[in-house]
Amino acid sequence: MAGPAMLVAAALALCLLLASPGLAWYKPTAGQGYYSVGRAAGLLSGFHRSPYARRSEPRGGTRSLGGVGTFREMRPNLRSLAVCVEEVTPNLQSCEPLPDGRATFQCKADVFLSLSASDCRK
């Protein structure tokens, strides 16, 4: 005669085999399909833009007076230019410690940029 433990195990196995499968215990959310972890997450998983970021320039018939309309027309061209940092001169008198508890300071600086590709050095 089989022991009571063997009968209970057989009955449990039979119930599990005959029962219909239930819902999945884990369903991924409908949100983002990637999770950024650590500092190199953008390099490892590619660059992902926010779905709320503006993808193109707004189209509108409103034009500002003065030279602002000319600047808006030039702006797509400025995005394709190479920007090179020529020189950074920090103003040490403006440095203030940040309240993060580490030895981190915030300083003002003069930054000289160049829009010429010939000025870019590697």
Curated annotation (Swiss-Prot):
InterPro entries: Neuropept_B_pre, Neuropept_BW_pre. GO terms for cellular component: extracellular region. Residues 1-24 form the signal peptide. The keyword Metal-binding does not apply. The keyword Signal applies. It holds the Pfam family NPBW. GO terms for molecular function: G protein-coupled receptor binding. It is found in: Secreted. Keywords: Bromination, Cleavage on pair of basic residues, Neuropeptide, Secreted, Signal. The modification 6'-bromotryptophan is found at residue 25. Residues 56-122 form a propeptide. One of its GO terms (biological process) is neuropeptide signaling pathway. It comes from the Eukaryota. May be involved in the regulation of feeding, neuroendocrine system, memory, learning and in the afferent pain pathway. Belongs to the neuropeptide B/W family. This is Neuropeptide B. It comes from Bos taurus (Bovine).
